């Protein structure tokens, strides 16, 4: 009988978050008593099905050593050096797992600045994709009216929101498939902005799995306030 697949996670954390307008990378900002990345890693490491979490760090990251000694779940954490773009960091994270992961194992790639991920959403993603040959991602249906503009900022079209989703993370795919898809994209100098795009480019069809709307990514200063509220509310559930 074939062994069941293992689950691994990769967290690209080499970015600097320019839109936040702060002096330090956004993953090291304080949120609900800990740094953003500590909150994020805590969500992943606490899940019993995730074997280990690889954190892809910037080559000149001087802040990680200041929080690393006090991180929970030390036995689950691995680190590697990230790259110039998210796709480079994720690929390096996958390489770190080469001696651990089997081809059919699952890898969950999750944003370092998405600290409100709920345990139930990880459960839902794993359960929904358990028998899927490719994998998929968490997302939320678009609720707002969508507009397309020209380069001058003038509205040129209203885009139908039917079957339109906001892609979120984790994005979960088979280890070998994702590694090859990212390698092919990088070799073609295509800088995909998420893992699903690499899988789509390889000719596969990821599955969308609906998640909670509070699984936000911290991108702008006001997002910190919102994330603080969400984390406090989750503690009360």
Question: Where is each model-derived feature located?
Answer:
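Acidic helix N-cap motif at the loop->helix transition within catalytic regions
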Residues: 62-68
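Short phosphate-binding loop-to-helix
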Residues: 70-105
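Short aromatic-hydrophobic micro-motifs that form the base-stacking/packing surface
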Residues: 106-110
């Amino acid at each position: 009988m074939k062994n069941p697949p293992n689950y691994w996670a990769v967290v690209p954390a080499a970015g600097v978050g320019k839109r936040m307008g702060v002096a330090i990378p956004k993953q090291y900002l304080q949120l609900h008593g800990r740094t953003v990345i500590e909150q994020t890693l805590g969500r992943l490491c606490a899940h019993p099905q995730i074997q280990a979490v690889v954190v892809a760090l910037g080559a000149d990251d001087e802040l990680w050593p200041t929080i690393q000694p006090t991180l929970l779940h030390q036995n689950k954490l691995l680190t590697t050096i990230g790259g110039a773009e998210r796709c480079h960091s994720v690929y390096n994270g996958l390489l770190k797992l080469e001696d651990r992961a089997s081809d059919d194992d699952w890898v969950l790639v999750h944003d370092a600045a998405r600290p409100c991920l709920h345990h139930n959403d990880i459960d839902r993603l794993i359960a929904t994709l358990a028998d899927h040959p490719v994998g998929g991602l968490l997302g939320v249906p678009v609720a707002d009216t969508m507009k397309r503009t020209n380069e001058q900022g003038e509205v040129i079209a209203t885009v139908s929101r039917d079957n339109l989703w906001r892609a979120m993370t984790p994005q979960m795919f088979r280890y070998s498939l994702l590694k090859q898809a990212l390698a092919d994209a990088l070799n073609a100098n295509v800088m995909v902005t998420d893992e699903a795009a690499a899988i789509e480019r390889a000719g596969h069809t990821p599955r969308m799995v609906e998640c909670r709307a509070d699984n936000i990514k911290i991108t702008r200063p006001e997002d910190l306030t919102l994330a603080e509220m969400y984390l406090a509310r989750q503690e009360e559930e």
